[in-house]
Regions:
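TPR/TPR-like alpha-solenoid helical repeat scaffolds
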Residues: 385, 415-430
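Short helix-capping/linker turns of helical repeat alpha-solenoids
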Residues: 3, 11, 16-19, 32-34, ...
Length: 452
């Protein structure tokens, strides 16, 4: 402490005589409380005196103070001005900072080409932050032409210096073969380096690699571990995935209550997948008290973000009045949104609406059209419904052979009602007139299945 006080006294004498370095050092003393009571206002005053004499270090620090409001009122324009003065004298950290100013329009008019100019100056001096940002500019085509090879070059330099963001992006380039030969093992290696430094995005991606065995030996427990690390940092995708792990006992002991807890965290951040999953939990009372109203509410949030399966579920809520007012027209509206994205379940239920005239004018031909779309995607209920139409001549001519073919496709997937329908047909003989009782039984099965 005594040495710091003596140094402070020496700096004071030299600073008052106009020595720029002493003025800067005096600013440091006041900023850190070295040998004197901490005083940010005094620090800024001395930095300014040194900066006005052209001392680059003081110019950069003064710019920082104007940026953060330490010892002076925030002033983005002055922050950028002093930062640029320091950058022009070759201070790498200042070059990186003024690059950021031009990149974002902080205190200056946004100019991404100038941002690239300054990032390059700093990057060539080895500034790791600038190397990463320059790589990102090349990757995104921001301020320069898109060039994955150049992006990889700068990502590599920053990654090898230990920058977690660069390590994550370098891994990403290896994963997708952008600017470098695709190599999932190397991608996993760089994701791990980034993840171990706490990068949530890399932690989430590394979890996916372990879940699916991409570039590493498949390990569900490791996947859950990395999902949890990312989830605890607030990554919504990881929170949803961790919820799924608890929901299905993947890599962790099955725990429906914990699944709901993580789904809720992600859902409240707007994650549409978690919103849908949470809706399922409330619909079936899995990990939470059954509540069809809350289920419908979460399905709606997900559906409004365009998630096709949630749109289908919301349509069913409207069609059957589950937790929401019964409204077949709204059901059809949501089914239509879902089928536009190719959802086989919604295609089948839209077919049901046309078959029964629920929310739309009854049209058996359109019913068959939607059943067929669903069936051709391999959806067992769509296959069953299409088979029923062929068996009974609803919207298509009676064709027992085709009916049997579609029933068999559904039955092969374990659809019990299809197996019963096959037995009814076979007991009467395929290709001949089916006994009235057998036909009636099949129609009855079809009607029951329409309700799901």
């Amino acid at each position: 402490a005594k040495d710091l006080e003596q140094a402070f006294e020496c700096y004071c004498k030299a600073a008052k005589q106009g020595n720029a370095r002493a003025q800067n050092n005096l600013g440091v003393c006041y900023m850190k409380g070295n040998g004197v009571t901490k005083d940010l206002v005094q620090a800024v005053e001395w930095y300014e005196r040194a900066a006005e004499q052209g001392l680059a270090a003081a110019q950069y620090t003064l710019g920082y103070c104007y940026k953060t409001g330490e010892g002076v009122e925030k002033d983005p324009k002055k922050a950028a001005m002093w930062c640029e003065k320091a950058a022009e004298q070759g201070i790498a950290v200042a070059q990186n900072s003024i690059g950021y100013c031009y990149d974002t329009g902080f205190g200056v008019e946004k100019d991404t080409s100038k941002a690239v100019f300054w990032y390059r100056k700093a990057a060539e001096q080895g500034n790791v932050g600038a190397q990463y940002k320059l790589g990102k500019c090349y990757y995104d085509g921001n301020g320069t032409e898109m060039n994955y090879s150049e992006a990889v070059k700068w990502y590599r330099k920053a990654a090898e210096q230990g920058d977690a963001n660069a390590q994550n992006m370098f891994g990403y380039c290896y994963e997708y073969g952008e600017g470098v030969a695709k190599d999932l093992a190397k991608a996993a290696e760089w994701y791990r380096k980034s993840a171990e430094q706490g990068n949530a995005t890399a932690q989430y991606t590394l979890a996916i690699f372990y879940k699916n065995g991409y570039g590493v030996t498949q390990n569900k427990a490791e996947a859950a571990k990395w999902y949890k690390k990312a989830a605890e940092q607030g990554d919504a995708n990881a929170q949803n995935s961790l919820g799924y792990c608890y929901d299905h006992g993947e890599g962790v002991e099955k725990n429906s209550a914990k699944a709901v807890e993580w789904y809720e965290r992600a859902a409240e951040q707007g994650n549409k997948f978690a919103q849908y999953n949470l809706g399922l939990c409330y619909e079936y009372g899995d990990g939470a008290t059954k509540d069809l109203g809350r289920a419908a509410e979460w399905y709606r949030k997900s559906a409004e973000q365009g998630y096709a399966v949630a749109q289908y579920k919301l349509g069913r809520c409207y069609q059957y009045g589950d937790g929401i007012e019964h409204d077949c027209q709204k059901a059809v509206e949501w089914y239509r949104k879902s089928v536009e994205q190719g959802c086989a379940m919604a295609q089948c239920d839209l077919g049901n609406c046309y078959r029964q005239g629920h929310g739309v004018e009854k049209n058996l031909e359109k019913a068959v059209e939607w059943y067929r779309k669903s069936a051709e995607q391999g959806y067992d209920r769509g296959q069953f419904c299409l088979a029923g139409c062929y068996e009974n001549g609803e919207g298509v001519p009676i064709d027992k052979e085709k009916a049997l073919q579609w029933y068999k496709k559904a039955a092969d997937q374990g659809f019990e009602s299809a197996e019963l329908a096959i037995n009814n047909m076979q007991s009467s003989g395929v290709g001949t007139a089916v006994a009235a009782g057998a036909a009636a039984a099949t129609v009855g099965l079809l009607w029951k299945i329409l309700r799901g």
